[in-house]
């Protein structure tokens, strides 16, 4: 596993409650105290976990324990990790209230018998509308007009026909097939190139939908896009948009207004700075976030997009690509605006504006996911508590739990470190062949499937190259094989997978990359009463019945799989979930 550098910051904000000392009870000697909090993760924008409750347990010399009244305990909190060192929680007695996203450490202090006993624990505030640790996040490339520059000629994106790679109507078919292959797992798909001109065109404007993508029966391309978002829901898929807040092009309808408001990057002499080029004849420029925000233009284009496509709000998510605060090597986006006399806009000033952008979207019901963190921002800035998911994972997984910062892929050339898990992108597979999706099912089973399962448990410790999770789950190499187990229940043995599909009622997905014959798999504990199972082959067109009432003997299933085959396993007679 390649770990990415992350600096943990400590906040100064503290809250406390007065300690009331008490005497010993029943002659027992207090030896230590343990602080507990329930729930451990606060999700103020999801479900019921909006506040937490603290309890301090006293452990006595005779081995007994009891809960110590909160009125006798002093509680204090401090931020452990959060973007901008913000206060993460506030306390009122033994109750914990979320303030901002991040991780806080809560300490309890008890005075007894002339001694002070202390204990601490961490609490996580994930202020997101969606749980990205339990969602497959993908991108679907739709279109890009123009002739690519030489360095991009061989990219699959620019093969013949890239002006319209996938129409809105074709996109629904991709979504349907993907839902079949993934057995209905919750999904988010961000559309790339949905705007006029396709990918990397028209920015900073988001006001016109690509007319080339329109369905014949619709009056406008906007109607078709809104139709796709609504239809995608039928296949367990939230359709949203891939947007960009830093790039700009001269053909944009907003070009003159942004120039007039001094919102584009300039070189040291004050001339507009070309930030790059993707398509011949169309130079790319960059937006200066603080200037755009100050002029109210960022807020205006965000509001306009939400108003134009109201269906987006139900999905509660948007993806901002290339959300950078500096160029490679820490170079400023705009050398001209870096000068004190022109605003002194350092990368830190860009980050301050980016935080405002995150909050502005959130206040309107949206999470903002991104391409990455840390790679084009000041050292240590990972938008912890602001960005719920990174397309390319860049947090320290032992410090940032998946519910606070979830991953797309972790490695460009492989499936990533199996011990921590990795999800998938899908985009590169669809670019090659969106109709047949070769390799999609295998990658899903090797990456997202076990990652989703592991996301239900807490990473406890990484020791001797073994990762220990809560609930007894362990991921490590055993006798040269990559193993994920929970006791004697094996979920993974190299590229043979046997993993509960926890998003469905009772289902296991088995997959093998090399294939095998007559391999014995122990069923999980909650299947102990199952005496026979039905097998279904997973295909693009749905699940195909394979075998009925396969016997389970002594809690074990004997299974044979062909190379790259995946099957769905259900208790015999159980109804198969999902759509065709």
Regions found by a protein language model. Name each.
Residues 1-4:
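Positively charged n-region of N-terminal signal peptides that target proteins for export
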Residues 6-16:
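Bacterial N-terminal signal peptides
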Residues 13, 19-24:
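Boundary at the C-terminal end of the N-terminal hydrophobic targeting segment
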Residues 25-127:
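Extracytoplasmic soluble-region selector
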Residues 39, 110-112, 193-195, 322-324:
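A mature extracytoplasmic/lumenal domain signature
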Residues 116, 138-169, 245, 259-578:
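Active-site-proximal substrate-binding groove within the catalytic cores of carbohydrate-active enzymes
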Residues 133-134, 181-188, 233-240, 312-318, ...:
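Loop/turn elements at helix/coil->beta-strand transitions in domains of secreted/extracellular proteins
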Residues 152-261, 348-356:
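Aromatic- and glycine-enriched glycan-recognition loops and surfaces
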């Amino acid at each position: 596993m390649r770990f990415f550098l992350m600096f943990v910051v400590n906040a100064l904000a503290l809250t406390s409650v007065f300690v009331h000392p008490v005497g010993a009870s029943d002659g027992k000697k207090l030896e230590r105290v343990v602080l507990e909090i329930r729930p451990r993760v606060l999700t103020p924008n999801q479900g019921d976990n909006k506040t937490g409750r603290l309890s301090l347990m006293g452990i006595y010399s005779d081995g007994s324990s009891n809960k110590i009244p909160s009125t006798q305990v002093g509680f204090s909190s401090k931020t452990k990790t959060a973007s901008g060192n913000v206060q993460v929680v506030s306390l009122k007695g033994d109750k914990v209230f979320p303030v901002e996203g991040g991780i806080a450490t809560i300490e309890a202090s008890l005075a007894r018998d002339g001694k002070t006993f202390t204990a601490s624990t961490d609490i996580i505030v994930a202020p997101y509308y969606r749980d990205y640790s339990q969602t497959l996040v993908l991108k679907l490339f739709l279109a890009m007009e123009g002739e690519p520059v030489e360095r991009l000629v061989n990219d699959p994106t620019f093969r013949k026909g890239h002006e319209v790679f996938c129409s809105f109507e074709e996109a629904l078919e991709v979504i349907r097939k993907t839902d079949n292959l993934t057995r209905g797992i919750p999904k988010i798909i961000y559309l790339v190139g949905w705007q006029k001109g396709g990918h990397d065109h028209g920015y900073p404007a988001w006001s016109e939908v690509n007319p080339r993508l329109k369905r014949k029966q619709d009056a406008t391309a906007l109607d078709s896009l809104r139709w796709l978002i609504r239809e995608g829901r039928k296949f367990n898929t939230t359709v949203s948009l891939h947007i960009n807040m830093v790039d700009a092009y001269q053909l944009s309808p907003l070009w003159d207004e942004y120039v007039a408001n001094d919102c584009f990057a300039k070189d040291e002499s004050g001339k507009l700075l070309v930030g790059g080029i993707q398509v011949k004849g169309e130079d790319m420029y960059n937006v200066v976030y603080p200037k755009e925000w100050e002029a109210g233009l960022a807020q205006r284009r965000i509001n306009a997009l939400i108003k134009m496509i109201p269906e987006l709000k139900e999905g509660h998510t948007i993806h901002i690509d290339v959300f950078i605060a500096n160029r490679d090597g820490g170079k400023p986006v705009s050398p001209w605006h870096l000068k004190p006399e022109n605003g002194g806009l350092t990368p830190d000033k860009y980050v301050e504006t980016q935080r405002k952008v995150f909050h502005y979207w959130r206040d309107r019901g949206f999470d903002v996911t991104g391409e990455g963190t840390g790679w084009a921002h000041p050292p240590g800035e990972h938008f912890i508590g602001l960005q719920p998911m990174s397309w390319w994972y860049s947090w320290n997984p032992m410090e940032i739990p998946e519910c606070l910062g979830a991953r797309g892929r972790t490695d460009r050339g492989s499936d990533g470190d199996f011990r921590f898990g990795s999800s998938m992108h899908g985009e590169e597979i669809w670019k090659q062949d969106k109709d047949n999706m070769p390799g999609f099912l295998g990658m899903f089973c090797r990456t997202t499937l076990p990652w989703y399962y592991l996301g239900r448990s807490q990473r406890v410790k990484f020791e001797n190259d073994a990762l220990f999770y809560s609930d007894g789950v362990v991921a490590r190499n055993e006798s040269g094989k990559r193993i994920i187990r929970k006791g004697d229940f094996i979920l993974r043995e190299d590229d043979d997978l046997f993993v509960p599909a926890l998003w469905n009622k009772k289902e296991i997905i088995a997959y093998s990359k090399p294939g095998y014959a007559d391999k014995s798999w122990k069923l999980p504990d909650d299947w102990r009463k199952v005496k026979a199972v039905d097998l279904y082959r997973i295909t693009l067109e749905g699940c195909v019945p394979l075998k009925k009432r396969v016997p389970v003997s002594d809690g074990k299933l004997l299974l044979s799989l062909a190379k790259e085959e995946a099957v769905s396993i259900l208790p015999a007679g159980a109804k198969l979930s999902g759509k065709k």
